[in-house]
Amino acid sequence: MNKEQFKGKWNQFKGEVKQQYGKLTDDDLKEVEGDYDKFQGKVQERYGDEKQAVEDWAENWHKNNT
C-alpha cells in the first residue's frame, strides 16, 4: 500500500485499526490522520517488536478493501 492509497482509505481504516490494535489511542489516530509514515512511527512506539505484524495486517486490510 502506498502513501496515497493509505490516505485515501484513512477514514475506513482508522475505525478498524482501533478495533484490532487498541493500544493506538484516538489521539494517536488524530496525529496520524492518514500519514503512513506517522502511522508506522506510532505502531513502532506502541507495539515495538510487533510492528511488522501490524504493518502486515494493514497491508492485508488494504488488499481486502480495494
What are these regions (language model features)?
Residues 1-66:
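Intrinsically disordered, low-complexity, hydrophilic segments
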